[in-house]
Regions:
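A metal-dependent hydrolase metal-coordination microenvironment
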Residues: 1-74, 152, 157-194
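Active-site gating loops and adjacent loop-to-helix segments of metal-dependent hydrolytic enzymes
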Residues: 7-42, 61, 80-103, 198-223
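Non-catalytic, well-ordered alpha-helical scaffold segments
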Residues: 46, 76-80, 115
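Catalytic beta/alpha-barrel core
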Residues: 104-111, 158-162
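Conserved, well-ordered alpha-helix/loop/beta-strand core segments that scaffold catalytic motifs
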Residues: 107-137, 141-150
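Short amphipathic alpha-helical segments and helix-helix/interface helices
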Residues: 118, 146, 169-173, 213
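Active-site-proximal helix-loop elements at catalytic-domain edges
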Residues: 142-160, 218-225
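Short low-complexity, flexible loop/linker segments enriched in glycine and/or proline
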Residues: 143-146, 172-175, 198-202
């Protein structure tokens, strides 16, 4: 079973920490953590819509929310609404202009600490993974983060990812070996917000060996002994 805390923070950078093999008795704990994160995220999104309206970019937050599958609004939904209203020509343009924090409309929500989430997952007896490590960190920042994360219980880092090129994959593999971390992988499937990625199928020639899962599963079972 898998549960993820997709948005955590370290040194003001957004990191994605994934929890694997969450036990049923910990579902309520995870739900509580995620509910608080979602509350802060919604407050940020509502403020974003309010700030946009001040400069004439009028959006209906309730309408955006009702258009989502699960009732959770993210910036991709707001970007799509801006495009539908004709304020931008594409979702990409929205993210590169109005939705960037430097424009002043978007105020990032407070997020749980990455190290805190890793410690909680360790306390649950679950496996923690740093997903797509180069998304918001360069190599030096990653190397600064990993020793602290491993001390808190980090088990693995994603080495196989849809948007990694060959050099990034090889670097991620090397770093995993250097820090004694397991390798993980994923397509980064996010439903309708990433329509070009299917469940379990990434972009390009992404292929994740079954051995990757087996190593993670063995780590989980050994941890429980």
């Amino acid at each position: 079973r898998l549960c993820s805390s997709d948005l955590t923070e370290y040194n003001s950078k957004q990191l994605h920490i994934v929890g694997l093999f969450i036990k049923k008795e910990n579902y309520s704990d995870i739900t509580e953590i995620m509910a608080e994160s979602q509350k802060l995220k919604e407050e940020s999104n509502k403020l974003l819509v309010k700030n946009l309206a001040k400069d004439g970019y009028i959006l209906d937050y309730d309408e955006i929310k009702s258009s989502t599958v699960d009732g959770f609004v993210n910036r991709a939904n707001i970007a799509a609404a801006l495009m539908q209203k004709g304020y931008v020509s594409s979702v990409k343009e929205a993210f590169q202009t109005l939705l960037m924090s430097k424009f002043g409309y978007y105020v990032p929500p407070k997020r749980p600490s990455s190290l805190y989430i890793i410690e909680r997952l360790k306390g649950f007896g679950s496996i923690s993974v740093l997903a797509h490590p180069f998304l918001n960190m360069n190599e030096d920042e990653l190397r600064e983060f990993l020793p602290k994360a491993k001390a808190c219980g980090l088990n693995a880092t994603e080495a196989y990812y849809s948007l990694f090129d060959k050099a990034e994959t090889e670097l991620a593999e090397k770093i995993c070996d250097e820090y004694g971390l397991l390798k993980s992988g994923g397509s980064d499937f996010h439903g309708a917000t990433k329509p070009d990625i299917s469940l379990g199928v990434g972009k390009g020639n992404l292929a994740i060996p079954t051995e990757i899962y087996k190593n993670l599963a063995n780590c989980y079972h050994n941890f429980r002994l």
